[in-house]
Structure formats: structure tokens, C-alpha cells
């Protein structure tokens, strides 16, 4: 029989305090008319260049790639879409290129845009045994392009699996001997390939790489720098508004046991969408993800089971009249939760979009039920569930099903009811993203969690059910992550249903965030190191013009 939670001590996690506090409260930068005018002028220069450069040319491929990597492609969505479609159509008629760099670059750009280009284009670079020709090892640019292209593979694309192995091996062997700028670019790619890179982080790093390239276009570089700084000011203002909201809620004092990570939550959502048109959605989503983080800590690292039962029930009811049944110390949090979604409804009602909030509530309730299920297992004499049962619940408690749905609520674009129904029914891309999030989170944090009273992680469940070592479990989970990325790629060009590409891109970007923050350790929980530096790079330090 389960022990009474009244007899148990609270499973305190002793999370580290906030790094930032209310630091961004005073950030209220203004975007000058001069800045905006300069960016607009440069934007038109490159819009014209995109339109006038022949689609079926090397110059066009390089221009699109450079614009995308510098983080300014959002200004030219229509022009780039039209160009890539034309490039894709032309490639079906004429595929005589034998330049590894160009073939790889075209392949990556076309697949990134959501078109299925066959990986057979790389057969010309292989021997009869299917191995890539050793003569290619002298072509550093070609190797790097093929390496980047290989990350757009789907399952069972053996030629791209071989490409990844071949390029990784050779790039790792030569990187230390490359010139400085090439060394930086190759090292960055080996650490974080383009497909897995947060667009904003990638842009900031590529600005420096591009600047050190002797052949750079100085106007394009200036455009990227000005645009980066102008966007940064917008992001700082948003974060200032959110900091004021967070300070007024006073969670840091009322709930000191929980991770105080408002700035880190904003960075997370900035990774999902950084463009100006998503400003409202970013602010809405940051509030939601900070609340989800709070609930995670409450269910996992503070509240007793006797407190969690009525709290979960109240959230499932989603009714202010249920507040009296909530443990007194959690009533403030319950009120805050209802207020966030009520404000969403009021804001969206002006545009006749308030029905979207139903789906956001649905997913938050589902997330909290998953947190509660884990608390039930722990309360039941630390019951260790079967791996498959735990995996199904853990895919939800990872939070990415909730995130994939809720991040769409505040966007300006039209989203049909069918798209919302599709996404809450856990399509492959959402399940793959959630699996990656859960697997990377568990690999990075399960040993720390086991140092306190905590339910078994997926890794412990897998080890117990299959009688394998921790290292074997790690290999299994890393394989799941790799497969998850290939499934995400597949959904971009193999979907049977009509889902807007920007919806798929949000899920992709959520996955990029987890890949960035949990690659080596749990940077979100331990936010004083690399995560702090990333925030400084994107939200504190401007780019020198």
C-alpha cells in the first residue's frame, strides 16, 4: 500500500537561483526612424537582387543560402519560395552538375523548403560499392556542403547515412589544419549542423564567419548587422514587458522552490520564432511556458501527493469556482494560470480567433495530467512503470505537445480548425519532437534527479525492463533522437494533409531549442554557464556595425 504523502518530506530539488532577476526591466530601447529607413533601403536592394538573379545559377543558390544563414530571409519569404520552386522544377529536367558543393547546396535548400528531392543526385560521387570517392576528400567546401545536406535525410536513405559518416570522418581529421575562418565554420558545423541550429543563434555566429570571408558582400553584411540589432531592440522591449508581468506576479518570493527562469523561457520561445510578426505570440507563449515550468517543479519537486490531487482536479475543471479546493499556497498560481488564458481569449476575440484558446487549454490540462501521473507512480511506493507506459506519458510531460499547439494561438496567420485538430492528435512530427525532447532531457538530467526522491526516469525503466546497462540505454536513446530528426524531415515533404509550412517550422524550432540546451547537460536548470552566454549574445550585446 502506498505511503501517505503526509508522512513524506517534500522532495526539494534546491534549484539554483535566477541569473537575471529583473535585469531586463529597464531595457526600453527605441528603434530610430534612421535605423528603419536604412534597413528598408537595403531590403529593397536585396529583394531586387533575388528577383533578378537567374534561378538556375550558382549565384542564386549562394545568395539564398547566405541570406538565410545571416537571418534576414524572413524579409523575402515569397521571393525565396518562388525561386526554390523554380530551382526544384529545373533540377528534374537537368541534373548534370558534377560539383559536389553545388549539388549538395541545391539539395539542402530544396529539402529545407519542403520539397522532396531524391538523394540519388549523390550517386555520381560514389564508387560501385556505394562508398564516396576518396578524391572528394580534397574538396573541403564540397565535404562541408555534403555534411550539411546529409542532415536532411529520412529513414533508410543509405547514401545519406554514408555521406554523414564519410564527411564527419574527413572533416574531423582536417579541421585542425584549416585556415582560421574555415576552421571556425567547420567546427561550428560539426558541433551544430545548420538543420539543428537555432536560426537566431546561427545568424549571429554566421555574421562573424561571413565578415571574415574575403569575398563577402559588404552591403549584405551591413544589412544583416543592422537587422540583427533592430530585432534585438524589439526582443529587449518584449522581455522588459514580460519581466514587469513576472515581477508583479511575485512568484520568485511566493514559490522559492521553483526555477525562476523567465528570461530563459523567453529565450526558449525566441528560438521558436524570432520574427517581428510573432511578437504577440512570443509574449503569450513565454507566459505559458514559464507556468508549465512552475507546474513541473511543483509536481516533481515540492508538493505532496495530497496537495497535488485537488490541484490537478482544479486545473482539469478550469473554473475559478474550483479555487477553494486548491491548497491555499497554490491558489495564487491557479489564479495566474486562469488569467493568462483569459487574457489570451480577450485579445484574440478582437480578431474572432478566441476559439484557438480551447486547444491551448486542452494541451495544458493534458500536460498537467502527465505530471500528475508521474506523481502517482512516485506515491505508489515509488512504482516503476513499464517502459512503454512511461514513454507514452513522458512524451506528453516533455511539454512539447503543449508547446507545438499553444505557440500557434497568438500568431496572425490563418490557421484552420483542421490544423489545430491535426496537431492535438499527435502527428508524427509532434511525437518525434516530443521524443527528442524527452530523450535528451533524460540523458542530461536523470542522474541528478535520482539524487533526491524522484520517480524512475525513462532510462531507469528501460534498463530494468530490458536488462541493459546505462551505457546501452544511452545508445538506444541517442538512436531514438537520430530517428526523431529523420521523422521530422520526412514530415516536411511527405505529409498527406495540407498543413502550413510555418506550423511545421515551429515544431522544428522547438526541437532545435532542446538540441541546443540539452546537448551536453540540462542548461535550463543549470543556467549560469553556456545558457547565460547565449542570452548575452542574443539579448544583451549588439553587433558592431
Curated annotation (Swiss-Prot):
Q: Name one GO biological process term.
A: diterpenoid biosynthetic process
Q: Which CDD domains match?
A: Terpene_cyclase_plant_C1 (cd00684)
Motif DDXXD motif mapped to chain? 296-300
Q: Which domain of life is it from?
A: Eukaryota
Pathway membership:
Secondary metabolite biosynthesis; terpenoid biosynthesis
The residues the record assigns to binding Mg(2+) 2 are 296, 300
Catalytic activity as recorded in UniProt:
(2E,6E)-farnesyl diphosphate = alpha-humulene + diphosphate; (2E,6E)-farnesyl diphosphate = (-)-(E)-beta-caryophyllene + diphosphate; (2Z,6Z)-farnesyl diphosphate = beta-bisabolene + diphosphate; (2E)-geranyl diphosphate = terpinolene + diphosphate
EC number(s) of the enzyme?
4.2.3.106, 4.2.3.-, 4.2.3.104, 4.2.3.57
In this chain, Mg(2+) 3 is annotated as bound at 441, 449
Q: Which Gene3D superfamilies match?
A: Farnesyl Diphosphate Synthase, Terpene synthase, N-terminal domain
Q: Which cofactor does it need?
A: Mg(2+); Mn(2+)
UniProt binding sites for Mg(2+) 1: 296, 300
Q: How is the cofactor bound?
A: Binds 3 Mg(2+) or Mn(2+) ions per subunit.
Q: Which GO terms describe its molecular function?
A: magnesium ion binding; terpene synthase activity
* KW Lyase (keyword) present: yes
Keywords of this protein's UniProt record, alphabetized?
Answer: Lyase, Magnesium, Metal-binding
Q: State if Lyase is listed as a keyword.
A: yes
Family stated for the protein in its record: Belongs to the terpene synthase family. Tpsa subfamily.
Q: What is known of its domains?
A: The Asp-Asp-Xaa-Xaa-Asp/Glu (DDXXD/E) motif is important for the catalytic activity, presumably through binding to Mg(2+).
Functional summary from the UniProt entry: Sesquiterpene synthase involved in the biosynthesis of volatile compounds. Mediates the conversion of (2E,6E)-farnesyl diphosphate (FPP) into (1E,4E,8E)-alpha-humulene and (-)-(E)-beta-caryophyllene, and of (2Z,6Z)-farnesyl diphosphate ((ZZ)-FPP) into beta-bisabolene, gamma-curcumene and (Z)-gamma-bisabolene. Can act with a low efficiency as a monoterpene synthase with geranyl diphosphate (GPP) as substrate, thus producing beta-myrcene, (E)-beta-ocimene, limonene and terpinolene.
- Can you name this protein? Sesquiterpene synthase 12
Naturally occurring in which organism (per UniProt): Solanum habrochaites
